[in-house]
Design a protein with these regions (language model features):
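N-terminal periplasmic/intermembrane-space "pro-region" immediately following the signal or transit peptide
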Residues: 1-36, 46-54, 74-77
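Residues that define the transmembrane beta-barrel architecture of outer-membrane proteins
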Residues: 9, 35-43, 80-85, 134-138, ...
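Extended hydrophobic secondary-structure segments that form protein cores and membrane-embedded regions
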Residues: 13-15, 59-61, 108-114
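Transmembrane beta-strands of outer-membrane beta-barrel pores
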Residues: 19-25, 51-55, 62-68, 114-118, ...
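Extracellular loop and loop/strand-boundary signature of outer-membrane beta-barrel proteins
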Residues: 29-33, 71-77, 124-129, 163-169
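Membrane helical hairpin/interfacial module
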Residues: 56-86, 90-93
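Outer-membrane pore/translocation modules
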Residues: 77-84, 91, 104, 119-122, ...
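Signature for the C-terminal beta-barrel architecture of outer-membrane proteins
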Residues: 87, 92-110, 127-199
Length: 199
């Protein structure tokens, strides 16, 4: 731990860059049979503020996704430059639901804005780490509890964000995505029961 950063526990910050070369030979996603030698670049930067303004918290995440040296036109699987993939405000109440049997605080979190997250172990809702661009949504999300608790409930009402290659991404105003995922961990240290609804 660095002395200069000791009092910055309220600030989360990170930067990430990935460069990937792909040899796509007879790609099944294309209607032409040829070999493509593509370079995919993805840069992310994240800033989050917590604790210092509690119960208010916020986060902003930027992503720049580009692909070069392809025989095919740009598409939104590989190309989405200068985009905000997350920008949300959060109300965080650490002990709103008391403590669980393990002594952990059971918080209540209410978020609003643009978000990207994963649910049900990425099987039904994932931000697709392999693809060069990211799935995200705009709307509201409420979480009762946290991962260290013996139970947790995550519920949301969102509109999908449509990735636009040439303009700032916007939400699909005609489409809503609702859901809830429960996490029941009381009976076992190695097993979690996850009932869910999505529609």
């Amino acid at each position: 731990e660095y002395e200069a950063f000791r009092n910055l526990d309220w600030l989360d910050a990170g930067i990430d860059h990935r460069t990937r070369y792909e040899l796509r030979n007879d790609d099944i996603r294309r209607n032409q049979v040829l070999t493509d030698h593509q370079f995919l670049l993805r840069t992310r930067a994240y800033i989050g503020i917590r604790n210092i303004l509690d119960p208010f918290r916020m986060a902003v995440e930027f992503q720049d996704s580009r692909g070069y040296n392809s025989h095919f036109p740009k598409d939104n699987r590989d190309w989405n430059p200068f985009e905000l993939i997350q920008t949300y405000g959060e109300l965080y109440f650490k002990d709103a639901l008391g403590k669980d049997d393990l002594g952990n605080s059971r918080p209540l979190r209410i978020r609003g804005g643009r978000m990207s997250w994963e649910a049900v172990d990425r099987r039904l809702l994932g931000n697709n780490q392999w693809r060069n661009t990211t799935n995200n949504f705009e709307g509201f999300r409420v979480t009762f509890g946290q991962e260290s608790n013996d139970w947790e409930l995550d519920a949301w009402g969102m509109q999908p964000v449509i990735r636009n290659i040439n303009e700032f991404d916007g939400r699909s105003k005609d489409q809503w995505f609702y859901g809830a995922v429960g996490h029941w961990r009381k009976w076992s240290d190695v097993m979690t029961i996850q009932p869910y609804f999505m529609g």
